[in-house]
Structure formats: C-alpha cells, structure tokens
Amino acid sequence: MDSLEEPQKKVFKARKTMRVSDRQQLEAVYKVKEELLKTDVKLLNGNHENGDLDPTSPLENMDYIKDKEEVNGIEEICFDPEGSKAEWKETPCILSVNVKNKQDDDLNCEPLSPHNITPEPVSKLPAEPVSGDPAPGDLDAGDPASGVLASGDSTSGDPTSSEPSSSDAASGDATSGDAPSGDVSPGDATSGDATADDLSSGDPTSSDPIPGEPVPVEPISGDCAADDIASSEITSVDLASGAPASTDPASDDLASGDLSSSELASDDLATGELASDELTSESTFDRTFEPKSVPVCEPVPEIDNIEPSSNKDDDFLEKNGADEKLEQIQSKDSLDEKNKADNNIDANEETLETDDTTICSDRPPENEKKVEEDIITELALGEDAISSSMEIDQGEKNEDETSADLVETINENVIEDNKSENILENTDSMETDEIIPILEKLAPSEDELTCFSKTSLLPIDETNPDLEEKMESSFGSPSKQESSESLPKEAFLVLSDEEDISGEKDESEVISQNETCSPAEVESNEKDNKPEEEEQVIHEDDERPSEKNEFSRRKRSKSEDMDNVQSKRRRYMEEEYEAEFQVKITAKGDINQKLQKVIQWLLEEKLCALQCAVFDKTLAELKTRVEKIECNKRHKTVLTELQAKIARLTKRFEAAKEDLKKRHEHPPNPPVSPGKTVNDVNSNNNMSYRNAGTVRQMLESKRNVSESAPPSFQTPVNTVSSTNLVTPPAVVSSQPKLQTPVTSGSLTATSVLPAPNTATVVATTQVPSGNPQPTISLQPLPVILHVPVAVSSQPQLLQSHPGTLVTNQPSGNVEFISVQSPPTVSGLTKNPVSLPSLPNPTKPNNVPSVPSPSIQRNPTASAAPLGTTLAVQAVPTAHSIVQATRTSLPTVGPSGLYSPSTNRGPIQMKIPISAFSTSSAAEQNSNTTPRIENQTNKTIDASVSKKAADSTSQCGKATGSDSSGVIDLTMDDEESGASQDPKKLNHTPVSTMSSSQPVSRPLQPIQPAPPLQPSGVPTSGPSQTTIHLLPTAPTTVNVTHRPVTQVTTRLPVPRAPANHQVVYTTLPAPPAQAPLRGTVMQAPAVRQVNPQNSVTVRVPQTTTYVVNNGLTLGSTGPQLTVHHRPPQVHTEPPRPVHPAPLPEAPQPQRLPPEAASTSLPQKPHLKLARVQSQNGIVLSWSVLEVDRSCATVDSYHLYAYHEEPSATVPSQWKKIGEVKALPLPMACTLTQFVSGSKYYFAVRAKDIYGRFGPFCDPQSTDVISSTQSS
C-alpha cells in the first residue's frame, strides 16, 4: 500500500486544488479502476451500498480480499505495522488484534468476527480495507468478509441478513451492533458491542489480546490467536457476538476456515504476531487486511477493533468516508468491488456490522483496491513482515480502506471504536491512504455517494445496515443526514472547509485516529501518534477506552464526516480541493444520527453535483445544437441576401440594356441647334422626354410647368450665384458664356458660382437668359447632375454632337453619349463642344471638371476642384448654352459631366435635376463618371436629356439610370456607388436640383457624401440615380442645379411629383449653399417629390439641362459638397431629403458664454456601404476639413428614413441612435431592415453645448440590393 499510497497521495495532493475538470478526469480513472475491480469482484454491486453482500458477494469480495490480502501484505510491508501499529494500535492495538482475533474469531466465530471483523475489517478495510479482513479471509474463508460477511452476511446470514443482526450481534449489530460496536453500547454492544466490547472489553481476551495483542499471537483464527483470545475471544467475541459468533463461525469457517482462518490465522498470526508485537491490532488489522480472511479472526479485536474499528472506521469513515465518499461515489463501482472486498470485509464487518458491511460495500471499491494491493503486498511481503509493514501500510490501507470503509465506518459504529483505534493505528498510513480516498472522494461522485452511505453507516452501526440499504436505495438517508447535522454540533471542527474532505480526512483521520486512539484523549489528541499509542494502551488496558475511543472516534468521524460533507460540498462547489487538514472531533451517542445526517447531506450533495454535471452536459449539448441551428439560419440569410442582390443586379442589367437599346433607338434627339435658345432646347427636351416615354413625358410636362417657375428660380439661382460667386451671378445672368467664364473663376471661386451657373443653365435662361422655358427644361433636367464640382474635368461630359454626350473620363478622353432627347442633345452638343475644349481631363475627379465646355474652361475650376467644379460646371453650362445655342441643356450635360471627374462629391449632388432628369442626369453622370464614376457622365448625359439616361445605360450605369433616374451621379466618379446613392443620398442631391441653389451648396457638401451615394449607385444605378451623383465633392452639380434648380426647383417639384427624383435632388443641394437654401425652399416642393422616383423620370433631357446648370452650380457648390450639410451651416434638416425634409434641430435652452466663441458643429460627410456577409449597412462619416473654430463634438445623432410612397414629412425621419463622438472618421453598422425597401440616412453632430450642426446630405440605400456597397 505504501507504493499505492504514495502515488495516490501524490494524486491527492495534485487534487488538493483540483478543478472540476481534474476531478472529472480522476473520476474517470477511478471509474475505470472500479470497473476493473468490478470485473475482479462482481459482487461489488451486491454488497455495494448495503453492507450486506450476497453470500456470493462476500465470496467475490473474498477473492478480491485475497488479492487485497496480498496488497495488504505488501502494504503491511510498506508500512511498518508496528510503527503505525503503535499509532494505530491505540485503536488498532485492540483493533488489530481484534481485527485479527476478530477475523480469526470471525473466521472461527463468524458472528463476532463479522461484527468485530466488520468493525475491524472496517477499520481494517479502512485501514486495510477490511477487505483484507474479509476479503482475503472472505476470499479464502469464502466469506471472511463474506465469511464475516458471508458469515455475517452469508454464513452469518445473520450478519448479512443479520447484518444488522450478525453485524448487530457481531458488530454489535451492524446497525445496532455498529452502534454497539461503534458505540460498543448499542444493543449489539452485546453482540456487536458486546462483541466488540467483548472483543475489546467484553472480550477481555479480545481486549486483552487486542491490547495485549499477544493474543494476536494466538492466531486462533490467525488473528484470533494473534489477537489474544483471538480464538477464545473470537469465540467469546464471536460468542459475545453471540449470534454473530455462531453466524460468524460459518463465515468464520469460510473466512477463518478458508483464508480468514488460515490466512488470517497465518497472516494474523504472522501479522497478528507482528501485530501482536506491534499491536497486532494494526498488524492484525493489517493482517486483517492482509488476510482479510484474518479479519475473520478479528472477533476479539473486533470489539476493540470494533471500537477502534468503529472509531477508526469512523475516522476512516469520516475521513475515508469523506474521502471514500468521493472515492466511493466516484468508485462506487469500485466501491461495489471494494464493497465486495470490503463487503467481504464487510461480510466480516458486516457480520460484525451490517453497517460495516455496508461501509465495506461502499468502501470496498477503494478498500478492495487497497485490500487487493494490500493483500498482494502483504502476501508478497510475507505475513509477518507484512503484518508489521502492513500495519503501517494497513494504516495507510486502513485509511484507504477506511475511506473505502467510510461506508464501513459508517456502518461500523461498533467498528468505529476499533476502527478509531485502527484508524488511529492506520492514521499515518491513513493519512496517505486517506489522501487517496480524499482524491477519490474529490474526484468520484460514486465514492462520495458510497462514502455517504458509509458515513451514515458509521453513525449508526445498527442502523447502518438499514442505512446502507437506504443509502443503497437512496444515497442520503435521514439518519445519515441527522448524524451529519448533529456531527457539526457535537464536536464538529473543520480546520479548512476546502481541505476538510481531503485534508480533514487525511489529517483529520489521522488526528481522529489518534484522537480515537485515546477515546478519552481523542479530543485532546490531535495528530498524536502517542495518543494513539496511549489509546492503544488504553484500548489494551481498557476496552472502555476503546469504546470511548469508539465514541470519540465516532464523534470525530461524525464531525469529520460533517466536515467532509461540508468541505466536500464546498470543495465541490469551489472546485478547489485542499486535502491537508486535521480535525478534532468528539462525538457522543447521537453520533450515528449525526453521521447519518452527514451522509445524507453528502449523498444529497453528491446527487446535486451529479445532477449539475448532467445539466451542464445537457446544456452544452443544447448550446451546440442552437449554435448549429443559428449557423444554418445565418447561411440561409446570406443566401437569401445574395439571391436578392443577384435578382436586383439582374433587373438593373436588364434595365441598362433597355436603356442602351432606347438610346440607340433615339440616340439623340437632334441636339437643339446651338442657335436654339434654351427654351428651344427645353422644348426639344420636352419633346425628347415625351419621346423617351412616360417618364420623359412627365418630366417634360413638369418642365413645362416648371418653365414658368424657372425664371423665379433663375433669380434665386442668380442670387445664389452671386452669393456663391460673383461670376456665377454673371453666368446666372443667363449668359452661358458669361457663366462659363464665371464658372472658371467661380468654379475655382467655389460652389457659389456653380449655383449661379446652374442658374444660368437652369435658366437655360442662360442663353435664353431670361428664358424661363430653358430654365424649365433645365428643371426637368433635374438631372442636375450633381456633378461634383470637382468635375473640373468637365471634359468628361463633352458632347461631340447634340445627339451624343461626351463624357470625358478622368483621363479626359471624351466619351460620347448619345442623348435621347434631341433637344437635350442639341444643348449637349453645344456643351460637348465646349467640354471637349474643357476636357481637362482634369476631371480627375477632383477637379470639378465641368463636363461642358465650360468645364473645359473649368480647368481653372479644376484648380479649385470643388469650388471650381461648380464654377466650371456653371461655365460649361454657360458655354454649353452659349456654344450650343445657349441651350445650356447641353451645358448641363457637361455639368453632369462635371463632377464625376471632379469629385465624387459633386456627382453626389445628384443633380436632382428634375426627378427623372436625375435619372437621365444620373445616366449622364454615369457616362461622365465612367471616367470619374460614370456618374458624372451620366449626370451630364442625363442632363443632356432623358437620353442622358439612355446614355447612362450606355455607361453601364445607364441601365439603372433611366429607370433609376437617380443615377446617383453623386457617386461622383469615385463612388460609382452614386447610383446607389441615389437611393440613399442621391435623392438628396436631386432635391438640390430642385432647389438648384441650395442644391448646389449642398452639392459641395455632398461631395464628401457622394462617396456615400456613389458607392452604391453609380455602378448599377448611376443611370437610375443619375442625379444621385450626389456629387458630393462636386457641389458643382448642385451649384449648377442651383440655378437650374431654381428654375428646376419648381419644375422639379412638378416633375418631382412626376419624378421622385426631385426629392432627392433638392435636398442635398440646399444644405450645400445658403442661396441654395432659399432655392431649396422652392426645391422642397420638388424634394417632396420623390427624387427617387425621379430616377425613373426619363426627363433626362430636362435633366440634362438641369444637369448642366446643376453642374455649373456644382462647380460652385463643390465647396459645399452637397452631401455634407456641414457646409450649409444653417441646419436645414428639413430640406426635402428624399422623401421628406430633415427634422429641425432643437435649440438648446441656454448656451454658456464659452459657446459664443465657437461655431456650430461641422456638417459631416456620410457614406454608406453594404455588408455582404450580413444584412447590414455601414454608415461612415467624416468631415472634409476640420474647422478649428467649431466646438468639441459630443455625439453624433443618426436618423433613418424609410421611403414610403405616401406623404413625406420630417416626422418620418426617425432617430435610430446616438453615438458618442470619437476621432473621425467614425462608422457604425445597422442591421435589421425590411428587405426590398429604400432607406435614407442622415447624420448630424451635437456639440458639448447641446447645439446641433447641420445634417449631412442624406444618403440612401436599398436594403436588399448591393447598390450601396461603396
């Protein structure tokens, strides 16, 4: 057992702080061991929980016990029985002798032996898993354990059946005997206790032998002789055991006769002699272990043993019990086996005490193992050496066995005293052994349960059989619980909760054993081997002390059990196991109940732990299932999203193809002759629109309607232009040429000019100068590409001839896009001419390249990319107008051109040139943008005319553009997303168109935004979103729009209704420029029109004009970047964003004086992006330039607008969140959208003073489509 003990000890130590996982692993190991043991001892199950083993059980146990004997022998060798015997001897002396005598006696006198043996075995088993006692004996004796058990259980029949009886009798009635044995007083005290007593005290011989241990020499049964009286005592003990004795005899015969007697005799003799010498009780005990058949010879020692055993068992029970409880619970299978062995022991013990048997049963697994090892060891080493070493080993083993015997111990009340002594004897070894039990206890629930039963057995030896049975049936028995409950009260001392079980058991057992050793001293003795020796002496001298020990032992074991239970519980709960602990426990007669309670607690806890484990396992399984299901759902969602996107793209491609076809069909309505006035152009455009289709017709009608308004718009445009740029105003004057020049300067100047330019353009008036008609046409043009002012590469939009829009790609190469509406075309044509010259492919996106010739002029504009863009656009517009008859429309086209190259921003502007025109514009922009983003071109194209939309299709974006109308030029070049944008932001730009001026301004702001729009729209939707260009950068478009817008605005409104594009058109712009703002007001109406729908508007022609104008404006606007509200400090949240104007910003009640020196937060630039992996939209925003004069931003407020065909009111903008300000750029992801819907998003900043900055230009996106992917 030494070897065993040490490894186990190591294990235990490892376990001290074991986590649940470690414990589980240990449990698994133990289970395997148990299973092996089970295979070795099939009886385990039989005698498992109830001490009563089937007669067969003992036999099996006996086999096991035999093995155990060897182990015990080895263990004995490992431990110097004498060394430990002395310690153990206090209890063990008697115990050992008793055990051996008992065992021998048990063999001889099964009844006593069983009882005594039971206790002894229990103690032995605990010490040397009585298994040795009965096991070997049992094995040999056929029932030493069995014999005892068998005898008690089988042979004893009494013990077994009588377990209570035999145990009672023998054990003092396992139950009663246990109590008696354990108590030495309970009814079976006579038999059990008496036996025990007899053994111990009653059996003076036993006692004498036990104390004398010389008797052990008298190996009557091996130990009988060894135990002094072993035979006589066995006899007397057995006799004392009475029935047990007679019962035991059978068992004894088996045990003693077989192994018990012979082996016990020999082992006991050897061990007994050794034990005798050493306190045979230990050696005997060990022998008992060793012989396990010898245990049969433990009748006499049984009494003492019973007492010591009881105590020992109690201690063991407590410690081992606690340990064993875990161990047993863990190793319940093991326990079963052990029980078999122990049951054999228990058989002996059981004979002695049913409880013992039960304990044995519970304990047996461990005991069995230990016994096996012990027996093997003992056998291997030789009985004498074995006995002495065994004593120590047995001490260890006893500890293990004791822990194994915990159950035994429990049922060992009788044995308790003996056990106590044995335990004390085995304390040293038990410490190590106990560690193992503790480990086992810690790890296995089985052991724990078993331990519980053992513990309950300990408390009530008499009751134990029943308890054991109860425990077998249900781990917690009321009596056990009672005992556990009372234990703490009695003398429950727990040094460390965590360590209680293991440590407590280890040291506690030792201490308890020591204490038990001196029953009287038990309380006073802690970790006192000397006390143990004294106890031994006392036991030897006094059976009473043994009994006392038994009691104290019991008490201790009970309190220990309680400690163990609690500590175990704690340990289990905390997942930390500390094994080192010493506890003094003093218990009185009610220990049994207390122990029972403790055991019940332990069992309940174990059950709870098991249930928790099962629950955790089930929970983990459920979690995995749920995860799998969720994963599947996610995959499905992704699939549906992808499918929806594919479907959308398919539709767009189809639309684009149709657009291309249409374009080819009416490539360009003959462009208005250059000479034609804008009005002419407008007429042409109108015609074109009609030709183009209903959308165009609508646009046209809108245009016509707008035409009257245009003048006023123009005025605003002019105003805007003046505000934006002086030159633009000039342009506004409607001198396209003028505008052109203005554009250049103004472009550079900033978006302002663009507005005027736009005005000019819008005013088609430019050429017509006053011509409202042209203006109107421009409006239809809502195309107002938002050419980003940046369009400086106006070249982009060059139209080579009226029919064609020329898009200068960034490179500046010209791309001709045929404009559908001839009028538009003609306008464009003129423009194109200019554009070509313009072609500063400067358009490189940044430069507001006014698509139109103006743009070429724009080169200057290029210089000032954003600002310029507008100007340039304006210029192009002017140029276009001038060149092309002032038709301007064409100019617009260039404007559209404008931004793509310039800035995506401008494009973003989205020229909301007339709702549809947007679409055209978008298309145009697209065309333009191609270079930039296609958007610009489309925008231009759009502006050029509805055809523009067609051209957009050409661009590729074009496809979307017509229907989409909102091509999203806003994308401006970079953001081919413009088309998307249209959805989300583009509309805003379109709005801009409506209020051309405002738009312009916004446009510039938009510029930043365009990226937003552009991202989604340009590609697929450019045509669609045409205007959506949202050329953020190129506010140009807006600017252009602005002029146009004014004209357009009104028109846009009308056409807006026709084309929703209007909606978005205006909005963006207004934010961009103050003048625009005014325009915006007008635009609002337009805005209200759903700019988005406008996309559909074929109006491109009109759009075209508008676009040009818009572009022009855009040039100025670029600074504004329509998309970004910031530019328009005046928060115009309510601007007709897409479907509805943004909500007004509440004014803080009071501003601190510091706020006066700071300006409102800047207008952010918003970009949208689709998240492909999940159905989400990423909003990212930043500012174009950091304004140091602004107050610190506290948070950003996000608003969302779900587009609905019904009324559009600011209240439809819902605040979806507030994000604490972090260093820009910032981004957040939104999810959970209604698929197939269009959403608009806007962001505004709130500074630390509670003031709200302007909204960014709203950005739109289709939830299902990937338009918005930027």
Swiss-Prot record:
Q: Where is the PTM Phosphothreonine found along the chain?
A: T118
Give one Pfam family. ATF7IP_BD
In what ranges is there compositional bias, type Pro residues? Answer: 1134-1151
PROSITE patterns reported in the protein's UniProt record: FN3
> Which residues in this protein are found as Phosphoserine?
S57, S113, S445, S473, S474, S477, S479, S496, S559, S673, S899
Covalent link (Glycyl lysine isopeptide (Lys-Gly) (interchain with G-Cter in SUMO2)) residue numbers? K33, K558, K910, K938
User: Where is it mostly found?
Assistant: nucleus
Q: Does the keyword Glycoprotein apply?
A: no
The encoding gene is ATF7IP
Q: Where is the composition biased (Basic and acidic residues)?
A: 310-327, 333-343, 363-373, 524-552
Q: What sequence ranges are listed for the domain Fibronectin type-III?
A: 1160-1270
Subcellular location, in the record's words?
Nucleus
| One annotated GO molecular function | ATP hydrolysis activity
In terms of Gene3D superfamilies, this protein maps to: Immunoglobulins
Its family remark reads: Belongs to the MCAF family.
List, as start-end ranges, the regions of compositional bias called Acidic residues.
347-356, 496-509
Interaction with SUMO: annotated segments: 965-975
Return the protein name: Activating transcription factor 7-interacting protein 1
Q: Which GO terms describe its biological process?
A: DNA methylation-dependent constitutive heterochromatin formation; negative regulation of DNA-templated transcription; negative regulation of transcription by RNA polymerase II; positive regulation of DNA-templated transcription; regulation of DNA-templated transcription
What effect on the protein does mutating L969A have, as reported in its record?
Abolishes the interaction with SUMO
User: Which stretches does the entry tag as region Interaction with MBD1?
Assistant: 1154-1270
